[in-house]
A protein has these predicted regions:
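Terminal, low-structured helical/coil segments at or just beyond the last alpha-helical repeat
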Residues: 329-365
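Acidic, Ser/Thr-rich low-complexity linear motifs
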Residues: 94-97, 159-161, 323-341
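A generic structural signal for well-ordered alpha-helical surface patches
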Residues: 295, 312-315, 351
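TPR/TPR-like (Sel1-like) alpha-helical repeat modules
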Residues: 302-325
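Short, compositionally biased low-complexity segments
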Residues: 52-53, 147, 321-330
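Acidic, proline/glycine-rich low-complexity intrinsically disordered segments
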Residues: 1-275, 279-282, 289, 294-303
Length: 365
C-alpha cells in the first residue's frame, strides 16, 4: 500500500481543498481526515475515511478518552484507526469492478470474504479466491499465508472437512514456504501459530503469536489467537486481559464476538456463571449467526437454572450448524480441532461446560 508521508499530509492541514483535488495532486485513492479537541483532561478524536475519486464517506469514528499517558493514548488511537481502516479498505477495494483481476485483486476479494459472517460458504469462497491468487502468482507470500490461514480456519477449527489431516498438512507446508520467503512477516507468524495450535502444540503456538505481536502490536487476530491458546494451555488468568486489549484496539471488528465469547468462557470455567452469561450474550449479539455462541449460552443458562432458555439456545445452535456436531456430547468431544486443550483445561470444560450442556438436554451419545 502506498501511503503519503506525514509531512506532506500536514501541509494540507490549513488549506480549504476538496478531497478529490487532494487525491489527484497526491495520486491517492483514499483520504483520512480528522481533528482533535480538548476539554480539560478529556480528548475527542474524530476521523473519517473518504474515497477521493467519488467523495463518498466510507467510514467515520469518534473516540473520547482521558489524556493520561499521551504515548499510550497515541498507540491506542493509532491501533483503533489502523484496524478499522484495514477492514474498510479491504471491503472497498474488493468491491471495485475489475474485468482482468490479478493476484492482488483475488487476495483482496478473499480477505473481503473472510470479513463476511463466518459460514461454510464464506470460508469456501475465500479458499477459492486465494487459490486463484496463488495460481496467478506462485511466489506470493500473501496468497500462501491467506490460503494457509483459511484452510486451518475452515477445515480444522470448524470441522467441516473429512480431510482434516491432509488440509492441516497442506496449511503447514504453505506457511513454512511463506515464512522462508518472509521470516519477519507478522501475519505469517500468526498463521503459523494457528497451524501449530491446531496440532495441539500450544506452547509453540504461543511463541508464534507473541512473535507476530512483537512485529505488529496492532494485529488483533494474534491477540485473539494468543488468548485462546493461553486458555487451552491452562493459563486462564491471562486470557481476559488479552481479549480486552483486542476489543479496545478494534471495537467494531467482525470477530469481536469471538473475543467476548472467550471472556465468557473464562468466567464459566471459573464458576462465575452470571458473568459468563453477560459476555456470552454480548457474543451472541455481535455474531448471532455463529452456532457456538448459542451453544455457550445453552450451557451457561442451564448452569444458572434457566432450563427454558438453555433448551432454546441449544435448539438454535443445532439449527444454525445444520449437521451432527451438536447432536451429542460424544460428537462435540470428537470435534476435529484443538478446542479442549491441555488436561487442566479439559477437566474444567468437563465440570462446567459439558455439565451445562448435559443439563440443557444434550445426550451423551
Amino acid at each position: 500500500m502506498f501511503v503519503i508521508s506525514r509531512n506532506t499530509a500536514f501541509s494540507y492541514g490549513n488549506k480549504r481543498i476538496g478531497t478529490s483535488r487532494i487525491g489527484r495532486e497526491l495520486g491517492v485513492r483514499y483520504v483520512l481526515e480528522g481533528c482533535i479537541r480538548r476539554s480539560g483532561n478529556r480528548l475527542r478524536v474524530s476521523a473519517q475515511l473518504i474515497d477521493a475519486e467519488t467523495d463518498a464517506h466510507l467510514w467515520a469514528e469518534r473516540l473520547d478518552c482521558d489524556i493520561g499517558d499521551l504515548f499510550a493514548l497515541q498507540d491506542e488511537i493509532t491501533s483503533r484507526i489502523a484496524n478499522a481502516l484495514n477492514i474498510e479498505l479491504i471491503a472497498a477495494e474488493a468491491a471495485r469492478p475489475n474485468e482482468h483481476p490479478d493476484a492482488f485483486d483475488y487476495i483482496l476479494r478473499g480477505r473481503a470474504a473472510r470479513l463476511k459472517p463466518e459460514s461454510r460458504g464464506s470460508f469456501a469462497e475465500a479458499i477459492s479466491l486465494f487459490e486463484c491468487a496463488w495460481t496467478l502468482d506462485p511466489q506470493s507470500v500473501e496468497a500462501q499465508t491467506c490460503l494457509a490461514g483459511t484452510l486451518v480456519g475452515l477445515r480444522v477449527f470448524y470441522g467441516t472437512s473429512d480431510l482434516v489431516a491432509a488440509n492441516l498438512a497442506r496449511a503447514d507446508a504453505l506457511i513454512r514456504r511463506a515464512l522462508a520467503a518472509a521470516p519477519r512477516y507478522a501475519f505469517a507468524h500468526y498463521v503459523k501459530g494457528q497451524v501449530v495450535r491446531a496440532q495441539g502444540r500450544y506452547e509453540d503456538a504461543i511463541v508464534e503469536y507473541e512473535t507476530a505481536l512483537a512485529s505488529n502490536p496492532n494485529l488483533v487476530v494474534a491477540l485473539n489467537g494468543l488468548g485462546w491458546c493461553k486458555l487451552f494451555a491452562g493459563s486462564i488468568d491471562e486470557v481476559t486481559p488479552l481479549m480486552q486489549q483486542a476489543i479496545r484496539r478494534s471495537p467494531e471488528d467482525p470477530q469481536v464476538g469471538v473475543w467476548h465469547g472467550a471472556i465468557g468462557m473464562v468466567h464459566m470455567l471459573q464458576s462465575r456463571i452470571d458473568e459468563a452469561i453477560v459476555w456470552f450474550e454480548k457474543a451472541r449479539s455481535a455474531s448471532p449467526e455463529k452456532p457456538y455462541n448459542h451453544l455457550h449460552l445453552a450451557a451457561a443458562y442451564a448452569l444458572s437454572g434457566d432450563l427454558e432458555r438453555a433448551v432454546m439456545e441449544l435448539a438454535e445452535a443445532r439449527r444454525l450448524d445444520g449437521g451432527t456436531l451438536y447432536s451429542s456430547i460424544a460428537h462435540l468431544k470428537a470435534f476435529p480441532g484443538p478446542w479442549w486443550g491441555a488436561p487442566k483445561t479439559r477437566s474444567l470444560y468437563e465440570t462446567a461446560y459439558f455439565a451445562g450442556l448435559r443439563k440443557a438436554g444434550m445426550p451423551e451419545e
